[in-house]
Amino acid sequence: LDNLQDVDVAIFSACHGTPYKPGTASHAANAPAAIREALSWYSSNPEQLDLDTMKPVFSGKTVVDCGDINGSTTDGSANRQTINRTTKDILLTGSIPILIGGDDSTPIPFIEAIASQMPVVIVQIDAHIDWREEIGGERFGFSSTMRRSSEFENVRKIIQIGGRGPGSARPADLAAAQAWGVKFFSPVMFIRTGSLLSLTPFLKMPI
């Protein structure tokens, strides 16, 4: 992280967030490695033209992968502190941080770090809405990501796309999200409207 002054985007990954069962590795602990493998072609061919945008893959931007940060299967608090500190360190260089998880508890300290320095609009794409207050006494697990994020002062707007089916929330969770002002866009809404353009009014709302 000491040489990012001229870097546009800095990627780092966290294999472990806040476990519900300390000592048990996250179901998504291997995700960073899998994502890097899947994207290896793009990183090795940055000069290739992307016909969707009609621009080179990285469009002249400098992107650096900082690798995995240290994590623990037993100490969620330490993991959160490391993610938070790493994010702030990257922001201090002027680079844009991108976090690769890890389960859905890893964004909590990431969003907290960004929100400590600037207004934030969250767009979540997930089958689950993650508004549980706690599970088994743990308030920072992967089922509470959006609720915890909503508590950060600079989070101005939350749009959640893709929530579906049973198992995503209880009535109280949905009520809390709606009371906060979350805008939901479910697959059913997409089927009815036939277009993601129905999101446009949400995205154009003032921050």
Model-derived regions: residue spans:
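Conserved alpha-helical scaffold segments that buttress catalytic/binding sites
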Residues: L1-I207
